[in-house]
């Protein structure tokens, strides 16, 4: 990506093609990773009806986690290709070619963010199922995540959201960030045993980085709703430029 960024300084079109290849590879890795995790968590030689179950998926490698590679690939491809006019959904493919999408890039980002939040809560739900939801704290990310998924998806469907819609969305994303940071603290506390720090517990017990994915989704959601038009000041006059 650093090389592509340097190339973009002189040839944006060539850099875009390069990063597209990289992000397609990321999507491929994500899909393959999810497949291998599912296979690792099943019993292919077991009798029919017992080869896959919820219990197997709970204790299997995280089946949803690799899909984040695929979502990052989609985000990257969407970001790499410029929108001819902000919020028009018309991508500039170079050479005078354009691709008209059914949604603007901003709305497409919101749809992808809602899918990413859904993947996050599914992964968290499977992880927390290992403790049978006995701790009331583990219910918080589930409820907040479900609400955030609905709010983000709903905002993506609105062509002209109101101020109230935006306020609810921003508040929800802020809640996601708080939940992520709080979850990371609770996971670290769970991994610390007594007065000693055992590295193995950080590897085998509560994953202290996993809750930060909630915070990442919250930050991403806030970035998505920023004004897609960049404005620079030239002799005191604001000039709109394509994002």
Range-by-range predicted roles:
Residues 1, 58-62, 105-106, 127-147, ...:
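Transmembrane alpha-helix entry/boundary detector in multi-pass membrane proteins
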Residues 1-4, 62-83, 143-154, 208-227:
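Hydrophobic cores of alpha-helical transmembrane segments in multi-pass inner/ER membrane proteins
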Residues 1-7, 24-34, 114-115, 119, ...:
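Core segments of alpha-helical transmembrane spans in multipass integral membrane proteins
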Residues 18-33, 100-116, 167-182, 243:
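Transmembrane alpha-helical segments of multi-pass membrane proteins
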Residues 28-44, 79, 124, 175-191:
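C-terminal TM-helix exit segments that contain a strictly Trp-centered aromatic cap at the helix terminus
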Residues 36-59, 186-208:
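Interfacial non-cytosolic loop connecting adjacent transmembrane helices
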Residues 83-108, 234-243:
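Membrane-interfacial, low-structure loops and terminal tails that flank and connect transmembrane helices
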């Amino acid at each position: 990506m650093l090389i592509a960024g340097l190339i973009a300084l002189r040839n944006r079109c060539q850099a875009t093609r390069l990063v597209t290849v990289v992000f397609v590879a990321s999507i491929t890795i994500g899909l393959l990773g999810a497949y291998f995790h599912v296979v690792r968590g099943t019993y292919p030689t077991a009798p029919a009806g017992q080869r896959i179950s919820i219990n197997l998926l709970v204790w299997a490698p995280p089946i949803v986690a690799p899909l984040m590679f695929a979502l990052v690939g989609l985000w990257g491809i969407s970001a790499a290709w410029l929108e001819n006019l902000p919020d028009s959904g018309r991508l500039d493919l170079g050479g005078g070619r354009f691709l008209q999408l059914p949604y603007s890039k901003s709305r497409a980002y919101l749809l992808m963010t809602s899918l990413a939040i859904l993947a996050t809560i599914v992964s968290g739900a499977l992880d927390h199922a290992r403790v049978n939801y006995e701790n009331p704290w583990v219910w918080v990310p589930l409820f907040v995540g479900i609400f955030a998924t609905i709010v983000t998806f709903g905002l993506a469907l609105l062509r002209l959201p109101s101020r109230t819609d935006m306020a609810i969305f921003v508040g929800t994303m802020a809640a996601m960030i708080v939940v992520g940071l709080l979850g990371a603290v609770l996971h670290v506390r769970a991994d610390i045993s007594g007065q000693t720090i055992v590295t193995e517990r950080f590897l085998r017990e509560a994953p202290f980085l996993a809750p930060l994915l909630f915070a990442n989704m919250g930050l991403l959601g806030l970035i998505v709703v920023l004004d897609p038009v960049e404005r620079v000041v030239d002799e005191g006059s604001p000039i709109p430029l394509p994002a």
